[in-house]
A protein has these predicted regions:
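Beta/alpha (TIM)-barrel catalytic core signal, keyed to glycine-rich beta->alpha loops juxtaposed to Asp/Glu
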Residues: 4-145
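N-terminal Rossmann-like NAD(P) cofactor-binding module of classical short-chain dehydrogenase/reductase
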Residues: 1
């Protein structure tokens, strides 16, 4: 995976394609490629990226990026589903209210929202209880109301 579109990322991507074609990689992808850079690489590539890892959360939903990625069958992956806890994320009133409705935490509501919108999530935690909580998001579905 290319972490960011800096330097000779075209050359790096070509090398990754060769590794993929040689069977040395099951998939190749990119990270932090926003729509303009992603379109460049998708049109340049012989093997379209399997995944694009970008900052995606409730406050930055990446709707345009998701549209472009879907057109090219590239999976969007959130590497920051909790916005790093910034902007008092875990105390957002509407998220707390939704969580109370479902008996879930703000983190679980945020993860479920992203999952329901086709976003693969990578929540970060070093606490075992939070890791377990992050897995417990498949027993409810958010509704429009």
């Amino acid at each position: 995976m290319i972490h960011q579109p800096f330097g000779d990322y075209y050359g790096t991507y070509r090398a990754m394609e060769e590794a993929y074609k040689a069977g040395k990689a099951r998939a190749i992808g990119v990270s932090n490629f926003y729509p303009d850079r992603y379109i460049d690489i998708a049109h340049f590539a012989e093997v379209v990226p399997a995944v694009n890892q970008v900052e995606t959360h409730l406050f930055q939903q990446q709707k345009v990026a998701r549209e472009y990625l879907a057109k090219h069958n590239t999976q969007i992956m959130s590497w920051r589903p909790f916005a790093e806890g910034k902007n008092d994320f875990f105390n957002t009133p509407v998220l707390k209210e939704i969580g109370a409705k479902y008996g879930k935490s703000v983190a679980q509501v945020a993860l479920r929202f992203l999952l329901q919108n086709g976003v693969v999530v990578i929540p970060k935690s070093t606490h075992e209880e939070r890791m377990q909580e992050n897995f417990n998001v498949f027993d409810f579905v958010l509704t429009e109301d």
